[in-house]
C-alpha cells in the first residue's frame, strides 16, 4: 500500500512551503530542479524541514489543508517540536 506524506520545505528566501506527495525524496528533487510548484520555482533551493506520513491520501490531504491554514509561527513551532 502506498504511503502518503505531507511535508514542509524551507525555501531560499526563508519562507515555508507545505505540500503533499507519495515520494518525499523525489518531490524535493523536483522542487530543486525548478519543476515543482510555481511557488518554489523562484525560491530554490528548498530544504525539507518537516514531514508526516499517512496511510491514505484523504488523511494526508486533510492535514495538508490544515497546515496551510496555520500561521508561520504555528508551523515553526510544529517543526521545532517534531
UniProtKB/Swiss-Prot annotation:
Residues 2-77 form the GIY-YIG domain. Transmembrane segments: none annotated. Belongs to the UPF0213 family. PANTHER family: UPF0213 PROTEIN YHBQ (PTHR34477:SF1). InterPro entries: GIY-YIG_endonuc, GIY-YIG_endonuc_sf, UPF0213_domain. This is UPF0213 protein SH2523. Pfam families: GIY-YIG (PF01541).
Amino acid at each position: 500500500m502506498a504511503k502518503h506524506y505531507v511535508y514542509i520545505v524551507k525555501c531560499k528566501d526563508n519562507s515555508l512551503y507545505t505540500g503533499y506527495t507519495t515520494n518525499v525524496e523525489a518531490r524535493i528533487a523536483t522542487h530543486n530542479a525548478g519543476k515543482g510548484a510555481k511557488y518554489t520555482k523562484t525560491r530554490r533551493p528548498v530544504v525539507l524541514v518537516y514531514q508526516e506520513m499517512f496511510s491514505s491520501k484523504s488523511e494526508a490531504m486533510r492535514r495538508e489543508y490544515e497546515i496551510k491554514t496555520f500561521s508561520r509561527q504555528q508551523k515553526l513551532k510544529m517543526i521545532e517540536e517534531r
